[in-house]
């Protein structure tokens, strides 16, 4: 995990979190000047993407296949598909501290999309979708335990908080590459799956 560096969706932080042990290991890795193969670079990029969004290998392969069939740059379409997942939107809005926490909110039926309960974390949000919390005590308590973080909301989303303190999110438009918080070269992931997809 430490080798994959900063994963904002998994750790909930935007900054790298290294301990003394990690710094020591980094110094040892740099001192041994091994040549890293292209396969290793692609595999690491794939693992970073998969772990950040909390996907299984099969799910990521399915998203790559969908991105290949869609018009446009395969890498950018892949990131767009992953960023528009409901669990990621909830994380980006600050309703959950991590993507796994957002997934739990969705699976426990605390989230409404366009005033309907959605319990599928991989639900693909569309422009003009309204994301809110169910109006029941357990849903309010679940959200209170996940304090609304002070992170900036990306430009493709809008967050408004009512007088009662209930957050409501709006998807303005599809996400663009500049709004993605993850530092990754998505083309390496596409190249990794070039023979499988």
UniProtKB/Swiss-Prot annotation:
It is found in: Plastid, Chloroplast. The keyword Disulfide bond does not apply. GO terms for molecular function: rRNA binding; structural constituent of ribosome. SMART domains: Ribosomal_S4, S4. Keywords: Chloroplast, Plastid, Ribonucleoprotein, Ribosomal protein, RNA-binding, rRNA-binding. InterPro entries: Ribosomal_uS4, Ribosomal_uS4_bac-type, Ribosomal_uS4_N, S4_RNA-bd, S4_RNA-bd_sf. Residues 84-143 form the S4 RNA-binding domain. Part of the 30S ribosomal subunit. Contacts protein S5. The interaction surface between S4 and S5 is involved in control of translational fidelity. One of the primary rRNA binding proteins, it binds directly to 16S rRNA where it nucleates assembly of the body of the 30S subunit. NCBIfam families: PRK05327.1, rpsD_bact. A slightly longer form of the protein may be created by RNA editing; however this region of the cDNA has not yet been sequenced. This is Small ribosomal subunit protein uS4c. It comes from Adiantum capillus-veneris (Maidenhair fern).
